[in-house]
Amino acid sequence: MIRNVVDKRAVEAAVVDAQRAVAEFDGARQWLAAARQGPMEPLGAEVWVFDTTLAQVLLVKHRWRGWVPPGGKVEPGETPREGASRELLEETGLQPELLPDPAAVAVRSYHPGYPVTLGLSYATVVDAATPFVAEDGQPVAWTRLDEGWESCFPDDLLRIRQHAAWLAGRMGRH
């Protein structure tokens, strides 16, 4: 059941960002090539917010998903990058610039019983002392990457850790 048709601008931006993503999971690029031939489920977008030491990630406690990066559904008229930025602002009050290349592209279901769709993960780095404002009912917290967290997406921990290591290499840290 397709809940909303994804507009052409969003799909075109998703194709470009999927190609530019640092990491690909679940055969996402091939899935997108096939899925764009017909109506698609709404796209998902999230932001992996790292502290400047790349030792922590900012997570939001979702009511049934557990601890997850800030994110959500890409709204009509938005690109995935715009949707990720909007969700980050709504859920944390933060409005940093996202890094140029998306962190990852994956295929997943964001709700039990819903079909899978494309999810794009973007990244940013902010000072851990930067104040944030949590959305009502969704606490926000810095979480150390050397510790785990409860989430309905168990692969996220390793994926986010790998991206932090990749960023550290790009920044000349080891």
What residues fall within each predicted segment?
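Amphipathic, soluble alpha/beta structural segments
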Residues: 1-9, 16-17, 99, 112-115, ...
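Acidic, metal-coordinating catalytic segment for phosphate/diphosphate chemistry
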Residues: 2-46
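A glycine-rich, hydrophobic loop/mini-helix early in the fold
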Residues: 29, 37-66
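Hydrophobic alpha-helical segments that drive targeting, anchoring, or assembly
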Residues: 31-32, 37-39, 49, 74, ...
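A short gly/proline-enriched turn/hairpin at secondary-structure junctions
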Residues: 68-72
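Unchanged
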Residues: 74-161
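Active-site-proximal or metal-binding-adjacent scaffold patches in catalytic folds
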Residues: 132, 162-174
